[in-house]
């Protein structure tokens, strides 16, 4: 059985512990004074908890001191065996002041290291990358944006752009490297994007995920900070999917290409079950449904779920929010309840208190049962890159079997 990775969160905050905000950062322009809670699945009796008030805004405080990180490491190892340590942070891991010392200490214990999501903005010397590899770093997740240092300086606030890219190249030559590129229309798309991915292929990167830029509340900026950049109109979901396909078709033989919110051309996600080639599997799943329910989702998942539950006793309705996990109480308030059945499934990670969701969805006098759905029905491009087509389909089958079981348990039975 594969041993799990130990996650060590070094804390820190975007904009403070990352050498300054990138222009496109999801957390830029967020007002951290007197944050108001959204409500979420972790809230107890009242609306508001650490997660939906502070964590969602990455209000974490400064980096934790090195002794605290080592103490967390040692205490975790008392109870479970791990093969690798995943270093992550609310700030940028590369900006952690004792990163080399921490990695050296982890290496002395005999564990390998994954540098979680980093932009490399804290690396001011390529020797740092070499030392980290010597200290056991064998996997890196790197936010690239572009291999053009001028674009990194302008859009990522990267004062060490050339050095950061040299470090990235060294990591690519010596580690497993997964790269991320937030794609902004007219800035780093088109030929710039192809040049960046071509460089990553030449350097030896293992995978690249293209991430659609969000610039409005319905696209996912729920923290009151939209727009991030005035005058930029993000790609539509379909335009973005076409970009992912184009990059995959040109470079997919040399590097794994995925996209979020759409899609993974190799794994066939999200919602591989909606593909015609899997219709026979879908029909078998549909035959197991004997309850009635409504599923509330977002713009991206809606056409897939609508197709999956077509001609069943389950209907799917959407709110005007691209990503279902970012649905808030405000979105639910705009729903026309005439299409909502007596059992309602909301996304498990939706930012709404359970009691508030019930009040909103019962405002027409119908005493509806409100249930949070299955944790993950499909694989997003951020995680699907390590799955084969068969593994991704198996994941979805198991997830939908769980959901159907919940529908049959909570849903009003068909007459």
Swiss-Prot record:
Recorded source organism is Methanocaldococcus jannaschii (strain ATCC 43067 / DSM 2661 / JAL-1 / JCM 10045 / NBRC 100440) (Methanococcus jannaschii)
Q: What class of enzyme is it?
A: transferase
The Radical SAM core domain sits at: 2-256
Q: What are the transmembrane regions?
A: none
Phylogenetic classification of the source organism? Archaea, Methanobacteriati, Methanobacteriota, Methanomada group, Methanococci
Protein family = Belongs to the radical SAM superfamily. MCR alpha subunit C-methyltransferase family.
The record's remark on the cofactor is: Binds at least 1 [4Fe-4S] cluster. This cluster is coordinated with 3 cysteines and an exchangeable S-adenosyl-L-methionine.
Name of the featured protein: [Methyl coenzyme M reductase]-L-arginine C-5-methyltransferase
The UniProt entry, under Pfam families, shows: Radical_SAM
* Role, per record: Radical SAM methyltransferase that is responsible for the C(5)-methylation of 'Arg-274' of the methyl-coenzyme M reductase (MCR) subunit alpha McrA. This post-translational methylation, despite being not essential in vivo, plays a role for the stability and structural integrity of MCR.
Known pathway? Protein modification
């Amino acid at each position: 059985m594969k041993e799990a990775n130990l996650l060590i969160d070094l804390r820190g905050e975007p904009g403070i512990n990352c050498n300054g905000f990138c222009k496109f950062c999801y957390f830029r322009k967020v007002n951290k004074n007197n944050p108001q809670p959204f409500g979420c699945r972790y809230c107890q009796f009242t609306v508001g908890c650490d997660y939906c008030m502070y964590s969602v805004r990455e209000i974490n405080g400064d980096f934790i001191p090195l002794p605290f990180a080592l103490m967390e490491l040692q205490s975790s190892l008392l109870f479970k065996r791990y093969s690798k340590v995943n270093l992550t942070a609310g700030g940028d891991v590369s900006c952690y002041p004792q990163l080399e010392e921490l990695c050296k200490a982890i290496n002395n214990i005999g564990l390998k290291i994954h540098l979680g999501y980093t932009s490399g903005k804290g690396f001011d010397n390529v020797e740092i990358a070499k030392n980290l590899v010597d200290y056991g770093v064998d996997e890196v997740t790197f936010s690239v944006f572009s291999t053009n240092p001028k674009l990194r300086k302008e859009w990522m606030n990267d004062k060490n752009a050339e050095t950061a890219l040299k470090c990235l190249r060294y990591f690519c030559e010596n580690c497993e490297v997964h790269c991320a590129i937030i794609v902004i229309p007219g800035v780093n798309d088109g030929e710039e994007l192809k040049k960046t991915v071509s460089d990553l292929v030449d350097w030896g990167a293992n995978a690249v995920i293209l991430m659609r830029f969000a610039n409005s509340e319905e696209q996912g900026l729920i923290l009151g900070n939209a727009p991030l950049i005035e005058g930029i109109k993000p790609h539509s979901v379909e335009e973005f999917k076409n970009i992912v396909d184009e990059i995959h078709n040109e470079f997919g033989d040399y590097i794994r290409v995925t996209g979020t919110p759409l899609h993974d051309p190799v794994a066939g996600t999200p919602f591989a079950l909606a593909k015609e080639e899997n219709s026979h599997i879908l029909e078998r799943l549909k035959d197991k449904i004997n309850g009635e329910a409504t599923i509330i989702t977002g713009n991206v998942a809606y056409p897939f779920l609508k197709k999956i539950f077509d001609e069943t006793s389950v209907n799917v309705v959407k709110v005007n929010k691209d990503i279902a996990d970012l649905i808030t109480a405000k979105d639910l308030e705009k729903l026309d309840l005439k299409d909502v059945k007596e059992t309602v499934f909301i996304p498990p990670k939706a930012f709404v208190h359970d009691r508030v969701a019930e009040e909103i969805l019962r405002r027409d006098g119908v005493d509806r049962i409100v249930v949070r759905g299955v944790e993950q029905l499909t694989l997003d491009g951020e995680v699907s890159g390590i799955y084969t087509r068969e593994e991704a389909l198996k994941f979805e089958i198991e997830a939908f079997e769980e959901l159907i079981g919940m529908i049959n348990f909570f849903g009003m039975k068909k007459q």
